[in-house]
Amino acid sequence: LVLVPTNGKFGERVAHICEQFCNVKHIKYDWGRSFDLYELEQQLERGCYEALLICHNETSTGITQDAAAIAEICERYNVSFILDGITSVGGMPVHPLEWNAEAVVMGAQKCTAGPSGIAAVAINQNFVERVETIRKQGDTNPLYYFDMIPALKKGDDDQTPWTPAINLVMGWSAALEGLQEETNEARWNRCAHMAKGVR
């Protein structure tokens, strides 16, 4: 069972995607309203949740979730913390190790300024072990192209299981080089300045 609180369009999309593959408890907050952390903690205390998944930066309503506080709650109840960081990675501080996030999903086309059509998932060892355990139990979800096990095995050799979209990979690589030259802090400050300008 996965707990997915939402307060905007993209969080709701995340919840809908999760519903295709697992059991979900979807808590819908009013769009633009921050999550009630006390309510989330009560849910985790009462339920048998394996994970809590959030859309970190909800661009449809301009709300950034307090990922550090949510991560702390997840750790308290031994629940995996998963982050949709598509519009936060590259544009604001994201600390997967500090937050003990099991997975962070990111898209090239947002704050890393890469081409659309390519994404990445940063995962920790616990996530890998969980995937392997679920696979051994005979998981029936369709996953051929998105199977992380062959991707991880090939990744050890700097390869991919199938032909990647080379033009997108090279485009994102160039964008990441630009981010490295600009520095994370300068990019975060630039994004914050632009956000303030349009509010």
Residue ranges of model-derived segments:
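PLP-dependent aminotransferase-like
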Residues: 1-48
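Short beta-strand segments
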Residues: 5, 53-56, 106-107, 122
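Short gly/pro/ser/thr-enriched loop/turn and capping motifs at secondary-structure boundaries
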Residues: 10-12, 33, 88-90, 110-114, ...
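Active-site phosphate-binding strand-loop segment of PLP-dependent enzymes
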Residues: 35-90, 103
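Glycine-rich, charge-decorated loop segments at or immediately adjacent to ligand/cofactor-binding or catalytic sites
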Residues: 89-99
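Conserved active-site segment immediately N-terminal to the catalytic lysine
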Residues: 97-109
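Active-site C-terminal subdomain of aminotransferase-like
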Residues: 112-197
